[in-house]
Amino acid sequence: VIGGDECNINEHRFLALVYANGSLCGGTLINQEWVLTARHCDRGNMRIYLGMHNLKVLNKDALRRFPKEKYFCLNTRNDTIWDKDIMLIRLNRPVRNSAHIAPLSLPSNPPSVGSVCRIMGWGTITSPNATLPDVPHCANINILDYAVCQAAYKGLAATTLCAGILEGGKDTCKGDSGGPLICNGQFQGILSVGGNPCAQPRKPGIYTKVFDYTDWIQSIISGNTDATCPP
């Protein structure tokens, strides 16, 4: 996260660190057994850490889990990287709520343009040269009009959100992918992609719109693994 500060240790109990083949992503615990992240974070040797804050000094309740099952949406459009960038992971063992671990529920309404949203992650705090922090950084950004992202990026999928600061300076960045966008306390987005370098004016982040996938997510969690994704 660019332009943010160290997150409060108590504000990200649902935040997962997804580490796979040397690449870093975020994720969100949505109940005791399931984590949501971005599809493009899917690599081999995936490990999922919960209850983390300082990567050098582990919390006593920090846990490591592995994916037992992974669910994706099959693409219906031409395969742009922004389309259906969502992955639902079943953990190999459930986790219990503890001092630094608790799930974040799915949204009951979609966000509106102008909403203030929290971003967070262990991604780089400088760009284009990367500086990876030991602690997650957090910042506040806004849901922007979709036209801003359409002007900045070609081939956007309809099931995405556009969020950032119009004049730049605050943004998610490399290593934050898959992490949550939390607007008015609701889990609304999964970081998909953004500008390179990060935090440039009029180059906001693209987030998978969680609200559009709630039926799919709930179907899979309840055992209907043939559930279809939104178009």
From Swiss-Prot:
Uppermost EC category: hydrolase
CDD domains listed in its UniProt record: Tryp_SPc
Residue numbers annotated as active site: 40 (charge relay system), 85 (charge relay system), 177 (charge relay system)
GO BP terms: proteolysis
Homology family: Belongs to the peptidase S1 family. Snake venom subfamily.
Residues carrying covalently attached carbohydrate according to the record: 21, 78, 129
Peptidase S1 domain residues: 1-222
Cellular location(s): Secreted
Superkingdom, natural source: Eukaryota
UniProt cross-references to InterPro entries, sorted A to Z: Peptidase_S1_PA (IPR009003), Peptidase_S1_PA_chymotrypsin (IPR043504), Peptidase_S1A (IPR001314), Trypsin_dom (IPR001254), TRYPSIN_SER (IPR033116)
CC annotations in GO: extracellular region; secretory granule
Species of provenance: Agkistrodon contortrix contortrix
Complex and partners: Monomer.
Protein name stated in the entry: Protein C activator
The entry's keywords: Blood coagulation cascade inhibiting toxin, Disulfide bond, Glycoprotein, Hemostasis impairing toxin, Hydrolase, Protease, Secreted, Serine protease, Toxin
GO molecular function, one term: toxin activity
Entry comment describing in which tissues the protein is expressed: Expressed by the venom gland.
Function: Snake venom serine protease that selectively cleaves the heavy chain of protein C (PROC). This activation is thrombomodulin-independent.
Known uses: Is used in diagnostic practice for the determination of disorders in the PC pathway. Functional assays are either clotting assays or based on determinations using chromogenic assays. Sold under the name Protac by Pentapharm.
Disulfide bridge positions per record: 7-138, 25-41, 73-229, 117-183, 149-162, 173-198
EC number: 3.4.21.-
